[in-house]
Swiss-Prot record:
It comes from Brucella canis (strain ATCC 23365 / NCTC 10854 / RM-666). PANTHER family: 54S RIBOSOMAL PROTEIN BL35M, LARGE RIBOSOMAL SUBUNIT PROTEIN BL35M. Belongs to the bacterial ribosomal protein bL35 family. Keywords: Ribonucleoprotein, Ribosomal protein. PROSITE patterns: RIBOSOMAL_L35. The lineage of its organism: Bacteria, Pseudomonadati, Pseudomonadota, Alphaproteobacteria, Hyphomicrobiales. It comes from the Bacteria. This is Large ribosomal subunit protein bL35. GO terms for biological process: translation. SUPFAM superfamilies: L35p-like. Transmembrane segments: none annotated. GO terms for cellular component: cytosolic large ribosomal subunit.
Length: 66
């Protein structure tokens, strides 16, 4: 059976932590930020941990745990 390839798009967008959780950038900050609250803008600046259901899907795209 051939080796599983890593999805390059997922490799650029997600990181797997040492404990196995998946980190990603917060969504909703490309445009239209003028109407958002300062708290939203502040919270969207960093990364967030994905929910377990989403993390399970992302881990299939990253078989080598990049």
């Amino acid at each position: 059976m051939p080796k599983m390839k890593t999805k390059t798009a997922a490799k650029k967008r997600f990181k797997i932590t040492g404990t196995g959780k998946v980190k990603a950038a917060a969504a909703g900050k490309r445009h239209g930020m003028i109407k958002r609250s300062n708290k939203f803008i502040r919270d969207a600046r960093g990364t967030m941990v994905l929910a377990d259901a989403d993390a399970k899907i992302v881990k299939q795209f990253l078989p080598n745990g990049l």
